[in-house]
Amino acid sequence: MNYYEEIKNKLVDNEITKKIKDYSKNKSDLDTYYYVGKMLSEAGKHYGEGIIKEYSNKLTYDLNKKYSVRTLYNMRLYFEKICCNEKLQPVAAILSWSHYCELLRINNMHEILYYINICKQYNLSKRELITKIKNKEYERLPKESKLKL
């Protein structure tokens, strides 16, 4: 399997889909980033961690668009942290990609689930989510409330 060609083709397909179906942009993005994250996770197991940097350079050159190491790393984290987690999987497509990029910095899965749920419940913007994370809202919850999540 040629991981690079698979990733490149998926990203090109995603760019086409974005132009045709703007209304489903977020779903298309998350599906694509899930797939690319999965491919990067598998490629990393075969070729090592440096593959993300290599693919970033190649994708930026081939597609004339900036696919930074950080962006590709976030795609892999989205797949590994969110989509592969049984508790988080059912809610994986609820938020925008920018929301997930903020949540990927959190290591505690219960905390991520808490923030996903409040974003959904209160329709929080990315900026509002960042404020709640900076204010450590989850950490200030009583222990009993955390256990119910």
Model feature map: region roles:
Residues M1-L149:
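Basic, low-complexity intrinsically disordered segments
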